[in-house]
């Protein structure tokens, strides 16, 4: 138990109902939890054991100041666990005394058998506006070579506090590096929606994007919201996209079916599958997730043929409009690479997202810390070596 002001803070396991009620409360909403910290995410991740923890004056009565979904993965041959809080915990990072809740959290996880903990603090570190980056591309250039539009003082302060307490940034602190040690993207792309009209959003698109959206409309591309029955077609198109663009997510149809069912059981409509049809054929499919006042474009897939009718642009424009209509403050297009080199294959994804007129955000990334004791430190080193071999 740690004091907060004049009131002690208690950390303990809480029910999913209590957890969700906090996320939906004004205080919880202000902390901006992502879908990876919702209780439903535990049902998506096979092979992990989940803990729902809360802290505050009286967690069991719902008097909370923060919560965390913790995923535990057992280290082979031991009774020890790696504790992972994807894009969490959901906490007030503005509090300079992070020990008041972080200390009890780490102690609880140590007693639960964790040998190390990985967290994903929510504050941003740097931001680059699309208008700034477009003229600054070139051979060998990376985001870190460009002076940011904004450096977030909170992100800088949180990073310093974590380092002072023995945390290490996964993948290191290299300028412009993509955060290869992170499980979640270090660089993401945001389109602000708060205070903007749909006309503002349209004006924010670059000329190429507006032309492509109009082309899709002229060609008769129809955008509809699908259902779970359309997930097999989404996965088929995703396999096509992976082959074409040279990446591999490694997620099966069963994974997406589990995700769709779990997120929508928690809140109907939380995850939607958008389809772009042309002449009766599905040419592209994208997933949209909403939590509170945030919306995420999670995964996109498209066919190799008839790309000239621009189904993906049509999908994204519809999804932007729907997120705006739902009252979202931010549309998160998820990960982008750090390269500004048009000669690199990965740059195409960044270029496409820049066309929406948003901004690249460098998050604080993920941070790890072994929990006290030589045995835990040794297990952590062995676990890091295991991850590098994968």
Task: Cite the ranges covered by each PLM segment.
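A short amphipathic beta-strand at an alpha->beta junction
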Residues: 113-121, 330
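Catalytic phosphate/metal-binding cores of nucleic-acid and nucleotide-processing enzymes, i.e., regions
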Residues: 82-84
């Amino acid at each position: 138990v740690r004091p907060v002001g004049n009131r002690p803070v208690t950390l303990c396991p809480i029910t999913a109902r209590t957890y969700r009620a906090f996320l939906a409360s004004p205080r919880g909403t202000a902390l901006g939890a992502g879908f990876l910290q919702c209780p439903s995410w535990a049902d998506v991740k096979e092979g992990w054991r989940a803990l729902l923890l809360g802290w505050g004056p009286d967690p069991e009565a719902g008097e909370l100041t923060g919560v965390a979904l913790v995923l535990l993965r057992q280290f082979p041959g031991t009774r020890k666990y790696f504790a992972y809080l994807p894009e969490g915990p959901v906490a007030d990072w503005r509090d300079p005394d992070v020990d008041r809740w972080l200390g009890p959290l780490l102690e609880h996880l140590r007693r639960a058998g964790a040998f190390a903990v990985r967290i994903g603090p929510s504050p941003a570190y740097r931001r680059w506006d699309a208008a700034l980056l477009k003229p600054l591309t070139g051979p060998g250039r990376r985001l870190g070579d460009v002076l940011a539009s904004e450096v977030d003082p909170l992100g800088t302060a949180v990073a310093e506090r974590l380092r002072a307490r023995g945390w290490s940034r996964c993948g290191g602190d290299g300028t412009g590096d993509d955060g290869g040690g992170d499980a979640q993207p270090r660089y993401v792309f945001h389109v602000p929606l708060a205070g903007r009209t749909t006309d503002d959003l349209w004006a924010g698109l670059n000329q190429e994007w507006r032309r492509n959206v109009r082309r899709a409309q002229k060609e008769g591309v129809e955008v509809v919201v699908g259902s779970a029955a359309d997930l097999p077609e989404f996965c088929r198109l995703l396999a096509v996209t992976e082959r074409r663009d040279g990446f591999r997510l490694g997620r099966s149809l069963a994974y997406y079916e589990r995700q769709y069912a779990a997120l929508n059981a928690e809140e109907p409509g939380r995850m939607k599958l958008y389809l772009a049809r042309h002449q009766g054929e599905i040419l592209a499919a994208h997933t949209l997730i909403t939590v509170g006042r945030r919306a995420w474009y999670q995964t996109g897939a498209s066919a190799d043929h008839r790309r000239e009718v621009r189904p993906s642009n049509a999908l994204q424009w519809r999804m932007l409009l729907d997120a705006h209509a739902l009252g979202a403050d931010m549309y998160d297009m998820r990960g982008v690479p750090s390269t500004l080199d048009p000669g690199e294959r990965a740059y195409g994804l960044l270029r496409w997202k820049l066309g929406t007129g948003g901004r690249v955000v460098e998050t604080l990334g993920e941070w790890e810390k072994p929990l006290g004791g030589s045995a835990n430190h040794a297990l952590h080193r062995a676990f890091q070596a295991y991850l590098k071999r994968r």
